[in-house]
Amino acid sequence: MNKLIAGLEQQLAQLDAQSLRRRRRTTESPCAPRVQVDGRAMLAFCSNDYLGLAAHPRIIDALQQGASLYGAGSGASHLISGHSRAHAELEERLAEFVAPQIADARALYFCTGYMANIAILSALSGSGADLFSESLNHASLIDGARLSRANVQVYPHGDLDKLAILLAASTADNKMVVTDSVFSMDGDLAALPQLLALCEQHGAWLVVDDAHGFGVLGEHGRGVLEHFALRSPNLVYMGTLGKAAGVAGAFVAAHKSVIEWMVQRARPYIYTTAAPPAVAHALLTSLEIIGGAEGAERRAHLQTLIAQWRSALQLQRWRALASDTAIQPVVIGANDVAMKIAAALYEQNIWVPAIRPPTVPAGTARLRVTLSAAHTAEQVTQLVGALQQLEQQD
């Protein structure tokens, strides 16, 4: 056998032995609580479709209309000929959406949140900059920090005292603090008011990845900035549009000069084909729903389900992490046990993924339960009952 292939197969076997190999399941229906998976009807608690908009009829109609207006693809990068009227209108609407939190805001649309985060960190920092990164940040922020060529220092999760010491010791002209808003595997919120105060005190950017807060948090769904009533020119905000917004892509919002600099220097924006204009067209409808009465109703229902879950779930040995967001992790511990529990739920036609290292620390393998406004109270009750029964049997 080829030596290179043999080496890979040996490493794959090691993943199997540690219960760490990831496997894909194939869905055959729209994203929803009731979904067809590999030919099987399942109740899903694993998507990030927090407001239940991924299969919303109005958004589907808008996507189809966008394809009729603009075709299937953009055909080029934004700086050549791929920047359509739909992209421009979406960026204008996104800037208006976050304007209460960021003065003189502009927005820039990206194909993915991963690309947006790498673009921010590579364009706004660089050699000679000091970049302070939260220890539980998303992989895209970690990779962006590595690619930035900045001096990267990681501070412990939620340790503002340590961060304050690091900022005070920095002599760099360009300083940047980078954090998730809602931590994707724990569900807790960063202390953003205190983080922003530190950044303003020390003249640092505060980069906020609000992947799991945009659309969900705040009275109008404007995310964590609205939730905490934050407003500052030091803010650089990233929101994803494939989670609560139900479609695809991401955006960066900041002071207009920040965005103009990114247009000139952000390689993940410059050197890639623009997303299909039809997607941007559909997102205009999504934003309308998020910011309107229907969005408010969906957020209220989601909060009711979160409260129901936290009140009803009673565990003896497993640990439900303290979270007031749609992400509700249940820490099991060992990889093989977490996999066994996920498989047992699957046999009951309940789909909850087991999350293992390196995504989470060793010994903290967990079930990552995500709730959606599309779920019902009865479905949450079903999952609670199944989990409690499995814990007693384990």
From Swiss-Prot:
Gene Ontology biological process terms in this record: biotin biosynthetic process
Any single Pfam family the record assigns to this protein: Aminotran_1_2
General function of this protein: Catalyzes the decarboxylative condensation of pimeloyl-[acyl-carrier protein] and L-alanine to produce 8-amino-7-oxononanoate (AON), [acyl-carrier protein], and carbon dioxide.
Functional pathway: Cofactor biosynthesis; biotin biosynthesis
NCBIfam families per UniProt: bioF (TIGR00858)
Assembly notes: Homodimer.
Binding-site residues, substrate: R22, H138, T359
HAMAP family assigned to the protein according to its UniProt record, in alphabetical order: BioF_aminotrans_2 (MF_01693)
Signal sequence residues: none
Name this polypeptide is given: 8-amino-7-oxononanoate synthase
SUPFAM superfamilies registered for this protein in UniProt: PLP-dependent transferases (SSF53383)
Catalytic activity: 6-carboxyhexanoyl-[ACP] + L-alanine + H(+) = (8S)-8-amino-7-oxononanoate + holo-[ACP] + CO2
Encoding gene, per UniProt annotation: bioF
